[in-house]
Amino acid sequence: MTSTRQYKVSRLLQKELGQVFQREGNSIFNGKMITVTEVRITPDLGQAKVFLSIFPAAEKALFDKTMEHHTQHIRHELGMRIRHQLRMVPELQFFLDDSIDYIENIDRLLKQ
């Protein structure tokens, strides 16, 4: 169960990361559209799991390598944006959100 503070911080991070990816995402993912679908934050606000949806879909290995290379830059940009709202910028872990692919697969199976 998440507290009100966790919920507010996760929504703030989701909004600000969306803006960071809107500005920086073009150079990171070569023009692919990036959506921050969800942010889950630990109770101590020290770590955040960020779920991203990329269109057109990216390969998992390429996504992991790209995000590992750019995580510190993204965290720095996020820190510059939220420095007045949060005392500490959480460590970021990025995950590829495949829920849209799962929904499309279920929809395709139901149509058969």
Language-model features: where?
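Charge-rich, low-complexity N-terminal segments
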Residues: 1-47, 51-112
